[in-house]
Structure formats: C-alpha cells, structure tokens
Amino acid sequence: MFEKLKEKLGIAKKDEEHSGNVDVRGTSINVTANSRDFEEIATNLKISLLEADIALPVADRISNVLLKKLDDKSIRLKGDRNSVFKEAVRETIREVASVPPLDVIDNASKKSSYVIMFVGMNGTGKTTSIAKLAELFRSKGYYVVIAASDTFRAGAIEQIALHGEKIGVKVIKHQAGGDPAAVSFDAVKHASKVERSVVLIDTAGRMQNNKNLLEEMKKIKRISNPDLILLTLDALSGTDVLSQAKLFDEAVGINGYIVTKIDADAKGGCVISLLSETKKPILYIGTGQTYSDLVQFSLDWYLNRLLN
C-alpha cells in the first residue's frame, strides 16, 4: 500500500538505512547538509510529490515544510539518517494534513434517529460503502434503514436491496424511475418511529456536468434534512478527487469522505491532498470487498502504513 508515495518520498530503500543519505528522485539527501544543498532537493521533491498524485499547492507546502525541518535537524542530529528523514516526513504530513476527526458512531448515539446522505460519482463504490456502514451500525445495535434513492441507474434498487437482505437491515424502495426524494422521506419517517435508528440514503451517481441530477440531489437534502452528508471518492482517481469534492460541496455541502479502493492505490497521495486542500475529514476508507473491509481513518493509521 502506498508503494509509489514511499518511493517518491525516498523511504522505501532499506539499503540506505545506515548510509547517512536518503534518495529522493535520484538525489541523495544528506541530512547533515547546509541550506544551500537543499535547493536541488526541493525541486526534485516537488516533482516526485506531483507524480505521487499530490496536488501542486500541497506539494509546495510539503516540500517547503519538510526541507526546513531537515535543515533544522541537520544542525544537531546524528546517527540513523533514514529515521531522521522518516520522522521529518511524519511531522510534515501532520502539519499539512491534520483535520479535526468526525466520529459518526458517537454522533449517532446522541440522537434517537440519525440520517446520513451519501453522494458521489458512478464507480466510486458508494453503494458498497453504504452496505459496509450499515453492517457496522447493525453490529453496534442500531436499527438500520437504507433508502434506495438511486432510482435512475438500472439495477441500483435491486443491488442495494440485495445488500440489505444479506446484512439483515430494512430497505425502503419505490419503483424504478420514481421520485428519489420521496423514497428518502419514507425512510426517514419509518426510522423516526424507532429509537436508536440510522437512515442511510443512497443516491444516483452524479456526473460532474449533470445539472438535473445535481438539482435532484439538492431536493433529497431538503426533504430528508440529513445530519451528515458523506462523499465517496475512489483513491485511484488521483488529484481528480479535489474537483469532485469541490463540486459536491458547492452543491449540497459535504461533511466528510469515505475513500474507497485504498488497498489498490500504490500512490496514496490523494489522501494528503484531500485533507490539506478541503480541511474536511476522511471518516472511513475501503480496503476490500467484504462488509468488514471498512477502516476508521486516522492520520496515524495512514502514517504508520506510509512510514513503517
């Protein structure tokens, strides 16, 4: 996981562990160097970060902060230079990408009925993510209701209904082509009669230029009045996740993200870009196809897999 980003940051080469140098894009970083020696490194590092799917503004921040930390450390640190570099990377990403966490399970426990609306483009794993979160809530004793409000895509209602059957949760559905907002309304109304309930609203995958579907999404929000709106994003989309986040945030207001297919992403840079640029939390990441393959995200989790 994140092999490409590890390579670009120069922390994947074990043979350098005791050499005193760390390689970044063919440039040997000696952390005992003075500030003049970091100019070439800064340029190479920025290019390397861009190749690892880190957005340009974020790459600028990381390279500037990281190289300053290395320069500061070079004055006083001796020993394992690779460890010094890794610690500088850890401190830099914390500084650039730290966002206050959002615990959806804790938030849901404070209301008798909690409503979550899911949005995202086709192919990002939205429906599967809903099923995974439904299983998580069910396992914690919540009464879970899924609203099959994706009434446009062929087979979408059947797909979410099958998930509900496998998990053992209620699915509210209407006929194909029906009013998505009406489905969400019925689901919220049904759940409101049960204490400790959670409503998970599926919506149609919105293409970025489909204004009609975006308006329908706004209508669902008005009708269901969700406590939380989550955007599902595919880690393999790279820096395009930023344009998707901007689109949906402008349309309905996003509270956080579920990032899917993280297990298949060798680059890993989109996570840093997303946190740094939007300042909104990643709640969960998808690490596989089973219902249990949903991991609560934390920056520590990310850094441990990147640096260890």
Provide a role label for each language-model segment.
Residues 102-308:
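P-loop/Walker A NTP-binding module and the surrounding RecA-like catalytic core of P-loop NTPases
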Residues 1-117, 139-145, 166:
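Non-catalytic terminal/linker segments enriched in charged/polar, low-complexity residues
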